């Protein structure tokens, strides 16, 4: 086995620079350039119910700023994510969800969801709390209708 590991390392070192641009292209679901906006269909599912809506995220030089609005136009939450400190800050949360323990869970889950979206995954599930998050990008075709 050790004899093959040298060859595997050599092959990986040769192919990695060639494959990295292909893997990185188009995988992230987050806005990639400063000033870019992205829209997402949002679904938050819990055992006793769920919420759906739309999220708009804007990227600037420090991080991401987002706001989630439900189907009736009521703001569920607005947040910001700072790249340097890798932290999510909740600016406002819907009244019935504005409890310290819910805010803490939302903050942690949004951070993990944003990491997953950067890796190309549109969903995140908090198995401990039984909460599922889904942020599906809205394409240009859907918004022009």
Question: Could you describe each region identified by the protein language model?
Answer:
Residues 2-12:
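Bacterial N-terminal signal peptides that target proteins for export
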Residues 2-4, 19-25:
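Extended interaction regions within the primary functional domain
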Residues 10-21:
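Bacterial N-terminal signal peptides
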Residues 22-26, 33, 51, 61, ...:
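Intrinsically disordered, low-complexity segments enriched in small/polar residues
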Residues 25-29, 41-47, 56, 74, ...:
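Mature, soluble, non-transmembrane domains
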Residues 34-41, 61-67, 119-124:
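Short, hydrophobic/aromatic-rich segments at coil-to-beta transitions
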Residues 46-61, 65-68, 73:
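Structural recognition of beta-strand segments within beta-rich domains
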């Amino acid at each position: 086995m050790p004899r093959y590991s040298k060859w595997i390392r050599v092959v990986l070192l040769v192919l990695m620079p060639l494959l990295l641009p292909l893997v990185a292209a188009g995988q992230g679901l987050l806005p990639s350039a400063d000033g870019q906006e992205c829209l997402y269909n949002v679904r938050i599912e819990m055992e006793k119910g769920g919420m759906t809506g739309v999220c708009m995220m804007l990227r600037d030089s420090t991080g991401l700023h987002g706001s989630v609005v439900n189907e009736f136009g009521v703001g569920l939450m607005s947040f910001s994510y700072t790249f340097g400190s890798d932290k999510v800050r909740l600016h406002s949360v819907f009244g019935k969800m504005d409890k310290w323990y819910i805010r803490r869970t939302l903050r942690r889950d949004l951070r993990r969801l944003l990491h997953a979206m950067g890796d190309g995954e549109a969903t995140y599930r908090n198995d401990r709390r039984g909460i599922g998050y889904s942020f599906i990008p809205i394409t240009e075709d859907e918004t022009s209708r």
